[in-house]
Curated annotation (Swiss-Prot):
Transit peptide start-stop: 1-84
Job description of the protein: Mitochondrial RNA-binding protein involved in mitochondrial transcription regulation. Functions as a protective factor to maintain proper mitochondrial RNA level during stress. Acts at the transcription level and its protective function depends on its RNA binding ability. Part of a mitoribosome-associated quality control pathway that prevents aberrant translation by responding to interruptions during elongation. As heterodimer with MTRF, ejects the unfinished nascent chain and peptidyl transfer RNA (tRNA), respectively, from stalled ribosomes.
GO biological process, one term: regulation of mitochondrial transcription
Localization: Mitochondrion matrix
Main location: mitochondrion
Recorded name of the encoding gene: MTRES1
Residue span, S4 RNA-binding domain: 142-217
Mitochondrion is among the record's keywords: yes
Transmembrane portions of the chain: none
Descriptive protein name: Mitochondrial transcription rescue factor 1
Description of how the protein assembles with itself and partners: Monomer. Interacts with POLRMT. Interacts (via S4 domain) with MTRFR (via C-terminus). Associates with mitoribosomal S39 large subunit, peptidyl tRNA and nascent chain.
Keyword Transcription regulation belongs to the record: yes
Residue ranges, compositional bias (Acidic residues): 116-126
Organism: Homo sapiens (Human)
UniProt induction comment: Up-regulated upon depletion of mitochondrial nucleic acids.
Amino acid sequence: MAMASVKLLAGVLRKPDAWIGLWGVLRGTPSSYKLCTSWNRYLYFSSTKLRAPNYKTLFYNIFSLRLPGLLLSPECIFPFSVRLKSNIRSTKSTKKSLQKVDEEDSDEESHHDEMSEQEEELEDDPTVVKNYKDLEKAVQSFRYDVVLKTGLDIGRNKVEDAFYKGELRLNEEKLWKKSRTVKVGDTLDLLIGEDKEAGTETVMRILLKKVFEEKTESEKYRVVLRRWKSLKLPKKRMSK
């Protein structure tokens, strides 16, 4: 506080009015008191704007009590007050920006953790038969028919025929729209046989296991598809 007072005093003494006021104090000239505007009015304005009443006490002690004849112009310290207020606002703005970045990073990490947990659950599921193969493919979109065709390496016509025959399943439910969008964790089945006596059906299954962030040079999505060429499942009664 003492160092700040000295620096402030040194700065204001560079003004001509300050030296005139000081000369009046040394000579004891009463008229020197009328050289400048009243400090009380300015200090009230300054403390109100900055919301810091202690500034009024500080400047009053320095100039009014110790040097009563040194009546300086309020403009001598006004820039100091403005810079102080600006620095406070800048610090608050920086803190808010850092907080926003931290929140965005936290949301991305949470999303990544959810995806990892979902993949681990699929790996540990005891009901999933392990006679599968993981394939890295590239798809133009995440439409059901596009993903199934790519994963099973079959033609588009075969997918359409199976759809109209009611042989396509999405998450073990009958597919009603072949343009449905699929996501990570969805299973796509093509019915290839059934055993009415045993109450089972055989399907070719595709599981959308993973989607990479980077696309191919032709702007296709890079994915990992898990394929079962023959998977026997309990037959479910499908709604018409």
